[in-house]
């Protein structure tokens, strides 16, 4: 059976891994998943990422905790295959009054809502992270 929404699966694996206090989670890799994981690493929500394997690449995400609690409080899919959500630069949401991020897919690549606003771009809202 094929996977309908690989990005939602990735976010769910991160959410479940942190709820179970796992050190890391692994999943099948794709360019978009790696771009989202790199963005989460830059923003400090995950500790590290590794891509291994040539034929079927695996993405391994090392989860991050602070004083025993998961760093990621909220990770929620917004745009999905059945209902794509696009926003213009002025309509990009602020998550938790700027404490969280919205991951946006633009024509210049995957970036945060702050970076998209600064670049004057809108795009598809992939997920919210706080």
Swiss-Prot record:
GO BP of this protein: translation
Pfam family, one: Ribosomal_S8
Signal peptide as annotated in the record: none
PROSITE patterns: RIBOSOMAL_S8 (PS00053)
Source domain of life: Bacteria
Keywords: Ribonucleoprotein, Ribosomal protein, RNA-binding, rRNA-binding
Disulfide bonds, paired cysteine numbers: none
An annotated GO cellular component: ribonucleoprotein complex
Ranges in a coiled coil: none
Alphabetical list of InterPro entries matching this protein: Ribosomal_uS8, Ribosomal_uS8_CS, Ribosomal_uS8_sf
Ribosomal protein as UniProt keyword: yes
Gene Ontology terms for molecular function: rRNA binding; structural constituent of ribosome
Function: One of the primary rRNA binding proteins, it binds directly to 16S rRNA central domain where it helps coordinate assembly of the platform of the 30S subunit.
Assembly: Part of the 30S ribosomal subunit. Contacts proteins S5 and S12.
UniProt xrefs under PANTHER family: 40S RIBOSOMAL PROTEIN S15A
Protein name: Small ribosomal subunit protein uS8
Highest classification ranks of the organism: Bacteria, Pseudomonadati, Pseudomonadota, Gammaproteobacteria, Aeromonadales
